[in-house]
């Protein structure tokens, strides 16, 4: 059962006093705006980071500055796509103008960003994937790290019921299914686009080059501790 916000901040402060951590990783699948606000008002006593959704709160300069003062070193953000139509069809609830404003506000506040983008989803095409490239190029100065992933179709998902699916191999017991992309934007084409177009762009390459081998999102905030 989730902790109430006040209890969460009190326990974080108690643990920080007891353990004297260099960095706190908040493991919520998505830190709520209410908890973000509480962390800004009642800092845990050590730098912290975690995953959160793009909301209007993050598009506010003053709110982001308060997060920084409260110890926020980095936020992991699932933007997923730079094409609004794709986001809407996926039901992500993400508004790209808000995402743009949030990235700029976080940059201004001195909070690092680790941004996640997903390619090869059923509503995506190569053209809309290029919109994602355009989005990253436009916000290259506000994105510190990138995670670029190819979509895996969960076998029990609603999407799987409306797509032509198949096992990856005979006797496949995995949680995911291979599928025929409705627009022909198959995994091999997506992978080729990522490797030969997306990652080759100088703006993207510069961000990726700042990520050492075997480096994960849990190493990233250490580069931004003050």
Language-model features, listed with the residues they occupy:
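Radical SAM [4Fe-4S] cluster-binding motif and immediate context
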Residues: 1-112
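A structural motif corresponding to the C-terminal end of an alpha-helix
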Residues: 18-19, 70, 101-113, 139-142, ...
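Acidic/polar loop patches that form or flank catalytic/metal-binding clefts of enzymes
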Residues: 22-24, 114, 143-148
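Short, solvent-exposed turn/loop segments enriched in Gly/Ser/Thr/Pro and often Arg
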Residues: 27-33, 120, 148-158
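Short strand->helix junction
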Residues: 57, 121-122
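Hydrophobic, well-ordered secondary-structure elements that form the walls
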Residues: 67, 77, 115, 136, ...
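C-terminal accessory regions of radical SAM enzymes
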Residues: 127-226
């Amino acid at each position: 059962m989730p902790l109430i916000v006040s209890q969460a901040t009190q326990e974080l402060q108690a643990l920080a006093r007891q353990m004297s951590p260099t960095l706190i990783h908040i493991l919520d699948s998505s830190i709520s705006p209410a908890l973000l606000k509480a962390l800004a008002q009642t800092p845990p006593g050590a730098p912290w980071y975690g995953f959160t959704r793009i909301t209007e709160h993050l598009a506010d300069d003053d709110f982001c500055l308060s997060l920084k003062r409260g110890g926020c070193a980095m936020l992991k953000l699932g933007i997923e796509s730079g094409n609004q139509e794709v986001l809407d069809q996926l039901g992500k609830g993400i508004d790209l103008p808000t995402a743009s404003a949030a990235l700029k506000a976080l940059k201004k506040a001195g909070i690092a960003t680790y941004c996640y983008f997903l390619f090869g989803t059923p509503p995506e095409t190569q053209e809309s994937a290029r919109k994602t490239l355009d989005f990253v190029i436009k916000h290259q100065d506000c994105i510190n790290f990138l995670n670029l992933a190819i979509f895996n179709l969960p076998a029990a998902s609603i999407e799987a019921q409306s797509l032509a699916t198949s096992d990856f191999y005979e006797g496949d017991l995995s949680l995911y299914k291979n599928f025929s992309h409705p627009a022909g934007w198959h995994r091999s084409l997506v992978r080729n686009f990522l490797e030969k177009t997306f990652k080759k762009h100088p703006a993207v390459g510069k961000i990726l080059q700042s990520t050492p081998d075997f480096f994960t999102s849990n190493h990233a905030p250490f580069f931004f501790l003050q």
